[in-house]
Amino acid sequence: MSASAHSRGAEDSGLSAGPSATHRGRGPTARRPTRAPDSGSTDSGGDSGGDADSIETQFWEEWPVETKGSDVNDEAIQFEYTAVEGEGVPEVDTHFAQAETPWMREFALEVQQSLNDLGVPVNLINVQPSTRYGEFWRADVGHPMPITMNLHGPDPQRGLDPNPFLMRAHPETGGNYYNYKNDEVTELLDEQAQTIGDTEARAEICGEVAQLLNEDAYLIAANFPEVITVANTADWEGYIPTPGNGTTRDSFIWTQVNLQPQGDSTTWVKGVTSGIQGTNLPFSSGGQEEKRLLNVYDGLFDASPQLEIVPALATNADVVDDTTVEMDLREGVEWHDGEPFTPQDVKFSVEYYQENDAPQQAAFVRPIDSVEIVSESGGGRVRFNLTEPDASFLTQRVVRSAIIPEHRWSDIDSPAQYNPDNPVGTGPFSFVSWEQGSQIRMEKHENNWMWDDDIRRELVGEEYFVAGDGIDEIVWANVGNVSTLIGAMQSGDIDAIGTTVSNAQADRAANTSGVEKQTARNYVPTDVHLSHLVPLFRDKTFRVALSHAFDKEGFVENTLGGRGEAIEGQNLLTPILTPYHAETEPYEYDPETAQEMLQQAGYTFDGDDNLVWPEGDAWDAFAERVENGHASRQDLDQPDFS
C-alpha cells in the first residue's frame, strides 16, 4: 500500500486478534444504525437498490454522570464522524500540541503514518497547550475530537499510585477523556480502589485491569521518553534527577532546596517558555501556575526523589480503620507572615476546598467526609473520616494537598476570583514579586524544615544530598522558545532551562563550558487517545489493527535517539511503579498483518489504497462489533470476509 495519498500537513491487517484475546460476551445494545439518505450504496442486507446504513458518533449506553450518556447525545456530542456502509472511511481530525515537546510534531506524523498505512486519511491540527486543556480536554464530555495525543505531565502522584492513570478508564472520573466504558474493568477498578492495607492484593487486581485494557487496545501507549534538561553546573551543585521531572522542571522542589552556590551569585535563574496567569493555587487552572506556586505551599506529605512518600506538614499517618486516618503535624512551623501553623489550618483548608469546589484540590478532598482536631499539643493531631475506603488516600491524595492559612482565606467569599498580591504559605520559598508575562521571584523561607541539613539528607537521600545554606532566591524568567533559552544559557543569562529539550538541543547547549546535559527516567507516557464514541474506534478489530501499525521501537530509536523506552502493549503504568506495574503482551509492529485483519473483518481498500467501510453481511458484523465495543471478529465468532 501507499500511504502518501492520505497525508496532510501538520499545519492546518485474520492473523491475530491481539494479545490474549478472550470472549467476554456482548455489551449493552446501542442505538440502531440510521440510514444515510441518498448515499447510492446498497443496504445492510446486501440487496441492491436501497440506501446505505450508517452509524453516527454517539454515546452507546447510559453513563453514571449526567453530562455523558445515550440520553444526552444531542448535547454531549461535539463533533461528527459517521460510518456509511460501503463508502470510504472519512478523514480523522487528530489534535496535537507541537509546543508541548521538541519532538511532538514528529510523534504526530508517526500517528498519521500509522493510520495512513491502514488507509485512513488524517488531518493533523496543531493547537496551543495553553488553550487545549480548557477547550479540548473536557471533563464534562471528553475530547471533542476523534484523536488527541499527549505527553503527560510529571505530577508526583503519577509516580506513586496506579490510580492517576488506571482510573481514567472509569466512567465516573473526569479524566476519562476518551469516553471508554467497560463494565468488567469498572468493577475491578472499584475493587482495587477500596483494597486497603494489602498492597499485594491491590497490585494483583491492578494487573488484571492492565491485562484487560491491553487486550482491548483501548488507546496507544507509545513510550516513556527520557527527561532531558540543561543546567549550569559550574556555579551550582546539587541538581537532583527526579524521575519524570528531571533536574530543572517544576513538578518537584528537590533541586531548588538542595542547590548550593559555587560562585558569587545566590540567586538561581530558571528560564521558562511561559508565564503564569495568577497567584491562586487552589483555584487555578493547573499547569505551570500550580507547579510553581507549590514552592510557596506545603502539603501533608511529599514524594521523594526515589518516589517514596515522605513527611511534610504531617510527620506520620496512622490508619485507625478502613475509613479513618490520623496524622501528627510538624511542630514549630510558621506561615510566611510569622503566624503559627495549627491543626485548625488543616481542618479549614479541607472544608474550604469542599465548600468552594477548589479544582486543584479536588483529588485531595474528594474522599474526605470530615476532619477533626484530635489534639493541639506539639504540632497537633488531626483525624480524617473518609466516606469510603480509599487505597490512594495516603499516596496520591495527600501528596496533592496544599494547606492554606485560615487567617488569610477565611474572609474571601469568592475564592475562584481571588488573586492574592502576596500569597502566603509555609513552603521553602516565600513569594516576592510577579511581573505578568515576564518573571516570578521567590526567596528562601528560613523557617522551613527543608533547610535543615539532617532533615534534607533524610528526605533526598545520601546519593543526592549536598550540605550548605542553599540559594537565597529563585527566579523564573519567561525567556521565550527553546532556541532562545539555549542562547540565554550559553550567554549566562539563566542558570537552567525549566522545560524538556531534545537530545540534539541539549548537546548544542552543552557545548558551552559549565553547561551540562542532564537526564532522568520517566514514569509518564506519551499516548494517543482514541474517542470510543467514534464508530471506527468502537470497533475493537480496528483498534487492534492500529496497535500493530504503530512503530513504537522505531520512534524511540529514530526520533528520540534511543533516549526512551518503548511501551510493551497498551499499558500506561511504568515499570518504575512497583509493585503495580504488570507485564502486558506487546503488539508486534506489522502493518501488513494489520491490513489483513481489517480485510478479514470486512473492510476493503479502493484503488488508491483508501480504507472502505464494510457492506452487506460484513456491515452487519461491523455493526455488531461497534455495538459491543469490546469484542473483535474472533471474539464474536464472525466469519472471515476477506
Spans of model-derived segments:
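Surface-exposed binding/hinge segments that line
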Residues: 318, 363-411, 423-435
